[in-house]
Amino acid sequence: MASPCAQFSPCHCHATKDSLNTVTDVRHCLTEYILWVSHRWTHRESAGPLYRLLISFRIDAMELFGSELKEFSNSLPWDNIDNCVEIIKCFIRNDSMKTAKELCAIIGLCTQSAIVTGRVFNDKYIDILLMLRKILNENDYLTLLDHILTAKY
């Protein structure tokens, strides 16, 4: 059985928005972030400003997917990426031109789903990362980058 690391801190964990300059940076940051938030010994209060912003996207997720976000998140078929993507797309007005609010909601939903509760550990974070890669396109990453760079946090 693994034991808690002294610190599990990806390179963007304590970063600011200034550390994101390209679509590749955003992809890398989101990958690290999902891994970080799904790590069972993560102390979310230790997150830096960028990760705190990403964590706050759960509020956007509740606005788009409903106030019972945890239940909605638990009901998604994360192990069936295609079905999961199709269900999430039902909440998006225009899949090819997602708004910043919709993108934040998707990240917030993924955050809620990735959080490990109790001592249960699974590999859902892999499914979440695959779903993100499938649902987000190049324009979405640019919109998200612009939103992060202009956000006040």
Curated annotation (Swiss-Prot):
It holds the Pfam family Poxv_Bcl-2-like. Coiled coil: none annotated. Gene3D superfamilies: dsDNA poxvirus (1.10.437.20). This is Protein OPG005. The gene is OPG005.
